[in-house]
């Protein structure tokens, strides 16, 4: 069975983006070059690539839609990402039980991501938490 190893995004402001994900989610910087920064949570890596990277040339590439983060406390983590420059997007997804389960945001580069509760991950996505 294959396992997800990394997610890559192309941005103009690599350092600003890396600092946002380090401060907001505790990702660790594991690699850096002039045109890429690698962050990791110890399982999956987030690679932040500058458009000048020779491996990223070409106008036909498709971008990333959004990232999803599993968090213990949606309210607490929402406050943290907003303090680091994220902007909340759209409405809130609620479970049938009425508890808040997911919020969507945009990071300082405009990249969308969501914060998901363990209950939503387990009940909707069937992810063991």
Model-found features: residue ranges?
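Amphipathic alpha-helical segments
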Residues: 13-28, 81
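Short secondary-structure junctions
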Residues: 26-32, 87-92
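Conserved short beta-strand elements that form part of the metal-binding/catalytic scaffold
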Residues: 28-61, 105, 112-119
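N-terminal beta-strand motif that seeds the catalytic metal site of vicinal oxygen chelate
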Residues: 1-15, 45, 65-69, 119-129
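Vicinal oxygen chelate
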Residues: 4-12, 40, 57-129, ...
